[in-house]
Amino acid sequence: YLNNNFMIANEMAIKGFPMLRLEDTASFVLQCMEDYEVQHLPLLKDEYFIGLVSKESVLDIAVDQTLATIAENLLRIGVNGGAHFTKALELFSKHELSLLPVLNEQQECVGVITQKILNENIARFIGAEQNGAIIVLSISPYQYSLAEMSRLVETNNAQILQLNSFFEPATGAMIITLKI
């Protein structure tokens, strides 16, 4: 039995991270962001997620103003707790986030994923700490055969520890990275 829970957003979420409230002032928010070394924090009403406060949006208001003044204009970006971590990675990348709220089905914020936690899980997922040789192939998608690659590796008394692939849009080639 493999424990793959590290791949699920709920399992990656930090539970004790500060959550902002509508009555919090800009100066308080900026101090929290500095203390926790992030550029974003979730804004909640009761326990429900209303939006993601960015440092940039807070700098646009006076230090004594509350978050209620900007609540309507916030990004409403979060990841479902049951989602695979690659969904979190997609959101981090697309929106250039430093932190991502993890939400349950009722839109309650159950924790956050930081860039550090995400990076640790990516490293674990790709086996970055495992020893092995890395081979990068560029082939036509029609030539791709996982069974053939596996056969070639295994007949040479080795095994595939990790395999990643993607399409290169400019050339149409399939790029395959093997760790052996």
Language-model-detected regions and their locations in the chain:
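A conserved regulatory-domain signal marking ACT and ACT-like small-molecule sensing domains
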Residues: 130-180
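Short, composition-biased local secondary-structure segments
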Residues: 60-61, 113-125, 157-160
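Short low-complexity, flexible loop/linker segments enriched in glycine and/or proline
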Residues: 57-58, 71, 175-179
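Short hydrophobic beta-strand motif reused across regulatory alpha/beta modules
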Residues: 39, 51-58, 98, 110-118
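Signal for well-folded cores of large energy- and translation-related assemblies
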Residues: 34, 93, 123, 153-157
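Bateman/CBS regulatory modules and CBS-like beta-alpha motifs in cytosolic regions of diverse proteins
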Residues: 3-32, 43-44, 49-52, 63-91, ...
